[in-house]
C-alpha cells in the first residue's frame, strides 16, 4: 500500500479518568493507549499525523517519535474539526486513515482491509454489530447501501433500534475528504463538526460508501474511565494468553497470566498462576514457572525450574538452573548452567558459576563466583562501604560456611574453605581453611537471671 496517511485524533482531555495525564497516555499493558495504535499503523502507513490538544507537550515528550507530524487542535470543536487540522499536511492523491487515540485494540489486519476497500471505492468505514449500541452513531442503510450515520443524541426512536454502529474509524481518499470536510456544519445537538457528517455529503454527491464489519467488538472499544481501562486490560491479556497457548505454551489459568511486553518461548514450557511477564523475556524449551513469579527483561534457557514467588529482572539464566522459591534475581546477574539459587536468596550484579549452590538466606552482590562452589545459609557479601560498591571473587570449588560475612573487596581462592560464622576481611588462599572466631567460653557456674 502506497501513500497512506494515518490521522490519529488524540486531543481529548479524558476528564472521567480523573488523572493529570491526558487520556491517550493512560497505560494498557505497560504501553500508552496512543502507543498501542502507533504500533498498529507502523509499516502500514507512510506518514502518521497525531492531532493533539490537552497537555500536548506531555504527549509529545512521552511518545518521543520524530517520525510523527504533531498537529495542534487549539479548540475542541468536534472530530470533523480535528481531522481538518491535519489536512494541510496531506497530499490529495493519498488515502487518509482516521483513527482514535482511545481505541487501543484495533488490529493491523482490520486496518489493512479498510484501506484496501477505500482504494477501491474512495471511502470506506468500519462498523460493528453490538447487542447494546447505546452511545454509538447508528448506520442507516437502504438496500444494503449506507445512506447516513446518525449520532445517538440526534437519532429518532426508530433509528435507536439499529444495532449496526459506526466505530468512527474510516479510510478516505484525501481529496474527497478535504472536499467533504468543507461542507459539514455544526447544526446538531452538540454544536460540533461531526466527522461522520461527511458520509451524508458523500451520499448526496453520489459517492459510494463501502464498509467492513469488525468481527471482534472489542477491537473497536473505546476508553473513557478507569473501569473501562481495566476491562480492556483483561481483554488484551486473555487475547494474548490465547495466542500463546495456540503457539504451544501451557498456562494453568490464562485468566491469571499477564504479559506486558514481548514474550518468546520454546517448546513444552509451563507457567502456573499469577505470573507476570514484563519487558522482553525469552524462555527456552522445557522451562517451568511456578505460581506468583515476576520476570522482566530476562533471557532464560532450557530445562529451568523457577519455583514460586520469585522476582527476576534483567538477567541471564542458563540451562538446567533452579531458582527459588522466594528468590530475587536483580539486574546484571548471570546464572550459569545447573546453578541453584534457593529460598530467600538475593543476587545482584553477579556471576554465579555452573553447578554452584546458593541454597538459602543469602545476599550475593557484585560478586564473581566460580563453578562447583557451595554458599551455605546466611552468607553475606558485604559489598558497600557507605560510598562505593566493591567486588567479591570466589574461586572454583570453594566452600563458604554458614553465617559468614565476606567484606569486599576480597578474593576467596580455589577450593578454599571458610569456617562457619567467620567475618573474612583478607584474601583466603587456595586449598586452605580460613576462619575468624573468638574463642568459645563456657561458664560453669553461670545461672540465668530470675524475674524479680
UniProtKB/Swiss-Prot annotation:
Residues the record marks as active site: 360 (proton acceptor)
Chain spans, region Pyrophosphorylase: 1-226
Cellular localisation: Cytoplasm
Annotated region described as Linker, given as residue ranges: 227-247
Residues bound to acetyl-CoA: 377, 383-384, 402, 420, 437
Cofactor: binding comment: Binds 1 Mg(2+) ion per subunit.
Organism: Ruthia magnifica subsp. Calyptogena magnifica
Record pathway: Nucleotide-sugar biosynthesis; UDP-N-acetyl-alpha-D-glucosamine biosynthesis; N-acetyl-alpha-D-glucosamine 1-phosphate from alpha-D-glucosamine 6-phosphate (route II): step 2/2; Nucleotide-sugar biosynthesis; UDP-N-acetyl-alpha-D-glucosamine biosynthesis; UDP-N-acetyl-alpha-D-glucosamine from N-acetyl-alpha-D-glucosamine 1-phosphate: step 1/1; Bacterial outer membrane biogenesis; LPS lipid A biosynthesis
GO BP annotations, alphabetical order: cell morphogenesis; cell wall organization; lipid A biosynthetic process; peptidoglycan biosynthetic process; regulation of cell shape; UDP-N-acetylglucosamine biosynthetic process
Sequence segments annotated as region (N-acetyltransferase): 248-452
This protein's UniProt keywords: Acyltransferase, Cell shape, Cell wall biogenesis/degradation, Cytoplasm, Magnesium, Metal-binding, Multifunctional enzyme, Nucleotidyltransferase, Peptidoglycan synthesis, Repeat, Transferase
Name of the protein: Bifunctional protein GlmU
Family listed: In the N-terminal section; belongs to the N-acetylglucosamine-1-phosphate uridyltransferase family.
